């Protein structure tokens, strides 16, 4: 029996042009990508896959994500919206491309712009077929219908397709006895047609059969499988019970409170304390003492880690995914790096390490223990030796750079972070593509970094800071709220 995907693929591949414009819609994991990949393998005609990318500034560009032309292909090309139709026609004319197929990915995103650009391409390529692929969206479907675009839904999987997807590549004992209609219905509800989740269900069932040495499962074992597939209903029920109990307890306590207030004394910790206004502290910073390990302990605290001074060394940083960086640099260079750092001040005849947390127009805030000192620029630079020690967050795998030779997980993380930072809605890829390099350059340009497409120290620092997972150097006085603020020179 042919699956629905195979039937749709057969219909799309018909030699006779029974369709000109088609919108193939389905949920994530329903098989849209598989269909596009099968169509891309067609050796009898030219197949080009495009995707419209929109930056956080609202600028849009067409990217060629795939092209089955062996020579003179246009894969990884980037075109503006105005030139897309002309460039597409030029690319088809370079080879003998009769009845070409143009695939548009993620057509549910920015569909109005896609429709506008598509009209020009259709008029220039009268013998072409245009297949739009996206997710279900009533508004998008309504607009596509108005333009005469045929809608084809992958739809829900049948019971036969569900069972086939679960059993594919898995050696499961007695599948007919195990996968009852009730079980399949529950799995279908959890997986929502996502074949990757269905494959996970099959693998989980096989591993559980091997571990438990059984062909059938108890209700408890099925609940464990359902939780792996994303079923969190039992947790919600427990939370509801806990919340209900809490509300009842609070209500009873509130109702009984009035009978105790007249007889029981008020605890001292409930009596509001009148704030004491601290007198101005005019201590000389030269009298303050802090060791190097204490300064690094304070710097760890700025990053949100509580590390005792006796254990605060750089070799501990890797446990938090951090790394130490030290050297000599100008004040402006360290300000541009946008990270707090430890600076050594030569005050009189002694060396005092301080943690610089803010650099303003005329003053610098430094941490010394639990106190914050505000120093003038002129005085700070006159006593600072120019050295620094800072902490910075490396890649998820602990690397200082991410390149085309990095792991797929690192590249996927990088593109995901760039998409979030640039407000790009396309699906991230684990491949190092020219499109990824362009995203890197765009991110670097927007953060006033060197626009070289290289992901190193500065780019990683700003990526983590945009994600809110890195400490940063304050630039204004209002953000500092220490326990004690001491005015210094």
Swiss-Prot record:
- Name the GO cellular-component terms: cytosol; plasma membrane
Record-annotated membrane-spanning stretches? 237-257
Give the matching InterPro entries.
AAA_22, ExeA_AAA_ATPase_DNA-bind, GspA_C39-like, P-loop_NTPase, Peptidoglycan-bd-like, PGBD-like_sf, PGBDSf
Location in the cell reads: Cell membrane
**UniProt GO molecular function:** ATP binding; ATP hydrolysis activity
Q: Provide the induction entry.
A: Silenced by the DNA-binding protein H-NS under standard growth conditions.
Its main subcellular localisation, reduced to a broad class, is: membrane
Which residues does the annotation say bind ATP? 26-33
Q: Which UniProt keywords apply?
A: ATP-binding, Cell membrane, Membrane, Nucleotide-binding, Transmembrane, Transmembrane helix, Transport
Instruction: Kindly give the membrane topology term recorded for this protein.
Output: Single-pass membrane protein
Q: Which Pfam families match?
A: AAA_22 (PF13401), GspA_C39-like (PF21327), PG_binding_1 (PF01471)
Known SUPFAM superfamilies for this protein?
P-loop containing nucleoside triphosphate hydrolases, PGBD-like
Other comment: Part of a cryptic operon that encodes proteins involved in type II secretion machinery in other organisms, but is not expressed in strain K12.
* Biological function: May play a regulatory role under conditions of derepressed gsp gene expression.
**Record's family?**
Belongs to the ExeA family.
Task: Write down what this protein is called.
Answer: Putative general secretion pathway protein A
- The organism encoding this protein is Escherichia coli (strain K12)
